[in-house]
Swiss-Prot record:
ATP binds at R118, T164. One of its GO terms (biological process) is thiamine diphosphate biosynthetic process. This is Hydroxyethylthiazole kinase. Signal peptide: none annotated.
Length: 262
């Protein structure tokens, strides 16, 4: 693939409109992360308009963090709208294995053909129908334990699958890439995983999904590394992280991205 900086440069030049159906905890954080990176967020979730809006946006992201029947209607309408308009959409199957309600929702959204699926190891294992030790939205499984399931899920769904953790794994069922960028402070700030899904959507709006997803993970992780250089804890890290997303240059991303073929 081209240098990751090329993907960042394209995303910033095009400033894609990304429709984000995310959870109550994450909404403000996701919007600020996308704005800092150079995209344009729209938090449009109600079924009355979500499907219509998905045809206007350049990408859609759906996060299952706090589902309710009305929000589920909006998710499904948006996914159908994105598919009909040929727009990429990203599924974040938060805690998909935790309850029967979430398992059913995950299966229905998967049937609507996401372009990219981004989750932690336990979520990807559960979505693929494999045994998992996940606890709620947190992963109790290592990324390596989900790599084979991710490949099977990519093959069966046609989606690019990203398993995120200390070292991320991305596959389209044929190819694989690992990304080692990131910092231990990142999981100490709520909604950064949800925000990563938004960034993947922004990158996938402008470039092919496999390469765009890998570049998005490297960008997000490297911004975390840069933010940690000045942060003294999770609070200052969150502010520094937004600044790093805004200031990180394509050239710096090319130098700092730690990607390798898997």
């Amino acid at each position: 693939m081209d240098g990751c900086g090329t993907y960042l440069d394209t995303m910033r030049r095009e400033a894609p409109l990304v429709q984000c159906i995310t959870n109550f905890v994450a909404m403000n954080v996701v919007a600020n992360v996308l704005l800092a990176a150079g995209a344009s967020p729209a938090m449009v979730h109600d079924a009355e308009e979500s499907g219509e809006f998905a045809a206007i946006a350049q990408a859609l992201t759906i996060n299952m963090g706090t589902p309710s029947p009305r929000w589920v209607e909006g998710m499904e309408a948006a996914a159908r709208g994105a598919a009909a308009a040929g727009r990429p959409w990203v599924l974040d199957p938060v805690a998909v294995g935790a309850t029967a309600f979430r398992r059913g929702l995950g299966a229905r959204l998967l049937a609507l053909k996401p372009t990219v699926i981004r989750g932690n190891a336990s979520e990807i294992l559960a979505l693929a129908g494999a045994e998992t030790r996940g606890k709620g939205a947190d992963s109790a499984d290592p990324v390596a334990a989900a790599e084979a399931a991710a490949q099977r899920l990519a093959e069966s769904s046609g989606a690019v699958v990203a398993v995120t953790g200390p070292v991320d794994f991305v596959t389209d069922g044929r190819r694989g890439i690992r990304c080692a960028n990131g910092h231990p402070l990142m999981p100490r700030v709520t909604a950064l995983g949800c925000s990563l899904t938004g960034i993947v959507g922004a990158f996938a709006a402008t470039r092919p999904p496999f390469e765009a997803t890998a570049a998005a993970l490297a960008f997000f992780g490297l911004a975390g590394e840069e933010a940690a250089k000045t942060a003294t804890g999770p609070g200052s890290f969150q502010v520094a992280f937004l600044d790093a997303l805004h200031t990180l240059s394509p050239e710096a991303l090319d130098r700092g991205a730690r990607l390798e073929a898997a």
